[in-house]
Regions:
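C-terminal accessory extensions appended to soluble enzyme cores
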Residues: 108-179
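Conserved AdoMet/S-adenosylmethionine-binding subsite of the radical SAM
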Residues: 1-137
Length: 179
């Protein structure tokens, strides 16, 4: 229906099924933008907190869609540096990355044993990292053609728009929506 009416669309998923041949056949490469979320590269660890495709399957799906000519990105959401082997990820051949930093609430504190002391900013029920810490973390994300930040802490949004993201009009850097 979206293809028929000429609408652009964004698919954000943790499922590798989006790269199954039956789905590839119905998506329009000129209209579809796909982001596949990965929080860790460890299949076993991931299964303790996510009911989704294994990260290894998601990586394969991204590469298949990329090879097929789709506008696709890996979405590190949330990005928790202790959980992602960035060197290994950079060697996969994935071109584009969207980073969304962890925002911490009570549920997150119960699930993940990490140091939350640097999450000092508060907004809408969540603790967030200071901008300086986010910039420091981004220095480690290398080896990709494009890195974009998706920000939900309102005081940082303009920074990414004006100084970092390749497309200042679109925080997800969807190439199909670029004028």
């Amino acid at each position: 229906m979206l293809n028929h009416h000429g609408n652009n669309y964004l698919i954000v998923t943790k499922s590798a099924m989006v790269a199954d041949d039956e789905y590839i056949k119905v998506m329009d490469k000129n209209k579809a933008h796909i982001q596949i979320t990965v929080t860790t590269l460890n299949d076993d660890f991931c299964s303790t907190y996510e009911k989704a495709s294994k990260p290894s399957e998601r990586i394969k799906a991204i590469l298949k869609l990329q090879e097929a000519g789709f506008d696709v990105q890996i979405r590190l959401s949330p990005y928790i540096p202790q959980f992602v082997d960035l060197d290994k990820l950079a060697k996969t051949g994935i071109n584009r990355v969207v980073v969304e930093f962890l925002r911490v609430n009570t549920w997150i504190r119960k699930w993940f044993d990490i140091d939350y002391s640097q999450y000092t900013l508060w907004q809408d029920g969540f603790n967030h990292l200071p901008l300086e810490k986010k910039l420091e973390m981004l220095k480690n994300i290398t080896g990709f053609k494009e890195v974009t930040v998706c920000e939900d802490y309102s005081e940082h949004y303009d920074y990414w728009k004006e100084h970092f993201n390749p497309n200042p009009n679109d925080c997800c850097n969807l190439s199909i929506f670029t004028p």
